């Protein structure tokens, strides 16, 4: 059976790439089709797979400039030639699910979320451009919505990373999705060391992560805030932050683990699609404060593994943080919860899905 893997783009090693690497391990040597890649951004789990990029690779400056090319991405992903492949597995948060499978092939899409730019974060995307260009961009995003719905018919089986994303898939595309949470390396993220007295955020410095809300919450709680992550808002956030906020930028896995181990709590003030960092924190024995109705709620049982605030205001999040800080959360219980999202469990569930959806085939 010939298998092709499709991923939106390879410009970092975040949660989506971890999922892709785990899926790729089912199919050693299977080619990966991606719109563009950034040098040095392909992790060890994907290094043995041939990687094919689209024509956009030549105009993204090595994967550094790509968001303005959003209108060109549907055509680029549809241009991948997949003739002769029997199984297509796409890992999609933007356009990868819009690849055109050959006749007779089975297309399984692991959906991290439907395209943010066209749906739940459209208004945020519009605010990032000048008012003069907004009418043009709004019209283009409406076109992208139409394409997004139409191209969903190219998928035979959807897998969602959380109940929240499954609801979006049903609402936007009128399709059902099986929920299989992403794999987390709970063997690496383990408890250790002394618990410290700071709040931790692990997030890209972009508007929808609401880092400015996290800064306000930590100030009200009276604890230092450590922020791990990079992004275009770094300068603005640093300019308005008090001295008790420490921007650590991009860190090694070992440093990330140390931060989880020493934090008083992990704060997730935004609506996460799933949030692998939530599981990583619990695996290290650290409670989590997040939001009800978010993907975080698939991981955190409020009162057992932290607290889920009923809404995302500073006041509600401060109250949740104070409750968590005022009680003990046994590390064993947090660790046990995290182990339910292990790489091994993902492999069992995703492997079982493949067994169910693939027709019986004789080996070539």
Question: Where are each of the predicted segments found?
Answer:
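Short hydrophobic beta-strand element within catalytic cores of glycosyltransferases
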Residues: 267, 287-292, 300
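Nucleotide-activated donor-binding/catalytic signature segment of Leloir-type glycosyltransferases, i.e.
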Residues: 235-257
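A charged, aromatic-enriched C-terminal amphipathic alpha-helix characteristic of glycosyltransferases
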Residues: 312, 326-357
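Membrane-proximal helix-turn-helix segments that form the acceptor-binding/catalytic region
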Residues: 126-158, 166
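Acidic donor-binding loop of glycosyltransferase active sites
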Residues: 261-273, 286
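Conserved acidic donor-binding segment of nucleotide-sugar-dependent glycosyltransferases
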Residues: 301-303, 307-314, 323-328
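Conserved donor-binding/catalytic core segment of Leloir-type glycosyltransferases
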Residues: 186, 190-226
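Active-site donor-binding segments of glycosyltransferases and PAPS-dependent sulfotransferases
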Residues: 26-97
């Amino acid at each position: 059976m010939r298998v092709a893997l499709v991923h939106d783009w390879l410009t970092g090693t975040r949660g989506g790439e971890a999922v892709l690497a785990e899926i790729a391990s089912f199919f050693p040597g299977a080619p990966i089709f991606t719109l563009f890649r950034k040098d040095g951004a392909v992790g060890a789990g994907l290094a043995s797979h041939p990687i094919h990029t689209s024509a956009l690779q030549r105009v993204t400056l090595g994967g550094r400039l790509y968001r303005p090319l959003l209108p060109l991405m549907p055509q680029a992903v549809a241009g991948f030639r997949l003739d002769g492949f029997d199984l297509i597995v796409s890992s999609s948060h933007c356009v990868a699910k819009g690849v055109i499978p050959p006749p007779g092939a089975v297309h399984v899409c692991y959906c991290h979320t439907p395209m943010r730019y066209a749906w739940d974060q459209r208004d945020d995307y519009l605010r990032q451009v000048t008012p003069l260009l907004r009418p043009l961009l709004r019209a283009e995003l409406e076109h992208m919505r139409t394409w997004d719905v139409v191209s969903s018919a190219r998928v035979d089986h959807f897998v969602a990373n959380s109940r929240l994303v499954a609801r979006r898939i049903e609402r936007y595309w009128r399709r059902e999705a099986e929920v299989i949470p992403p794999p987390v390396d709970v063997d690496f993220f383990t408890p250790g060391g002394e618990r410290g007295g700071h709040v931790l955020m692990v997030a890209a410095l972009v508007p929808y992560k609401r880092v400015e809300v996290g800064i306000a919450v930590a100030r009200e709680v009276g604890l230092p805030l450590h922020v791990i992550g990079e992004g275009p808002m770094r300068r603005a956030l640093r300019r308005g932050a008090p001295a008790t906020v420490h921007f650590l930028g991009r860190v090694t896995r070992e440093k990330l683990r140390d931060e989880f181990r020493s934090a008083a709590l992990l704060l997730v003030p935004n609506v996460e699609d799933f949030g692998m960092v939530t599981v990583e924190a619990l695996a290290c024995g650290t409670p989590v404060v997040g939001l009800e109705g978010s993907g975080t709620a698939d991981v955190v049982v409020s009162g057992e593994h932290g607290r889920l605030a009923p809404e995302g205001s500073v006041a509600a999040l401060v109250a949740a943080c104070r409750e968590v800080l005022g009680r003990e959360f046994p590390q064993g219980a947090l660790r046990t919860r995290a182990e339910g999202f292990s790489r091994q469990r993902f492999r069992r569930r995703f492997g079982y899905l493949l067994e169910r959806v693939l027709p019986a085939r004789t080996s070539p």
